[in-house]
Design a protein with these regions (language model features):
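Intrinsically disordered, low-complexity proline/glycine-rich segments
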Residues: 1-201
Length: 201
């Protein structure tokens, strides 16, 4: 029996991040057929110190209407993972970082109804260079110059379910492709933000 598609499925979207001393901002756009930014789908802004606990996404930059969110299960144990909620605070899915496997290559687990997926940095060499960069005291405070990507695959069968590709530029810009209809847009968007904001870069 084929699993039902997610309530809100978007096969491709774009994410733009803006970083300041006080807040992180993320703008998520529908991708046009030519790859350009289309409709604004969600906006998130959070104080940097609070970002690891809970993030709320809004329908516009004025933050007039919250539409989904993700929240840490335990504030003192981020290894416990994060739950993603819809506008009515109903769970959509979850994700968690695999800290053991992330020592050399950032690794995550993604869960949705009828789906368990595992994601890693695509390039092992880039992953190692990022870690060496972070070990140098001065350079560790400078934005990482390496372009890195993540791929998530179904733990049963190994099919690609989601990918996040970072683009070169002053700001962080990402293209997120979701081939698997079981992955809700709100879960994919939350995971995409987490890949940027919740790991040491």
């Amino acid at each position: 029996m084929t699993p039902a598609p997610a309530p809100m499925y978007v096969p491709k979207f774009l994410m733009r991040q803006k970083l300041t001393m006080m807040v992180n901002q993320y703008e998520i756009y529908l991708a046009n057929p030519d790859g350009s930014e289309g409709e604004l789908m969600a906006f998130a802004q959070q104080k940097r110190m609070a970002f690891k606990e809970e993030v709320t996404f809004f329908s516009d930059r004025d933050k007039t209407r919250p539409v989904f969110s993700f929240k840490a299960r335990k504030k003192i144990d981020l290894n416990a993972g994060y739950d993603v909620f819809d506008e009515g605070r109903q769970p959509i899915g979850s994700f968690r970082k695999d800290f053991g496997k992330s020592l050399l290559r950032s690794s995550w687990h993604l869960s949705a109804p009828g789906l368990e997926a595992f994601g890693q940095e695509r390039n092992q060499s880039i992953a190692l260079m990022r870690r060496l960069w972070d070990l140098i005291p001065v350079l560790g405070e400078v934005a990482v110059p390496f372009v890195f990507h993540f791929d998530f695959t179904d733990t049963i069968g190994g099919a690609l379910v989601m990918s996040s590709e970072r683009k070169k530029g002053i700001r962080d810009r990402y293209t997120i492709v979701v081939p698997d209809e079981r992955v809700d847009f709100r879960l994919a968007a939350s995971m995409a933000v987490a890949l940027d904001a919740l790991q040491s870069r």
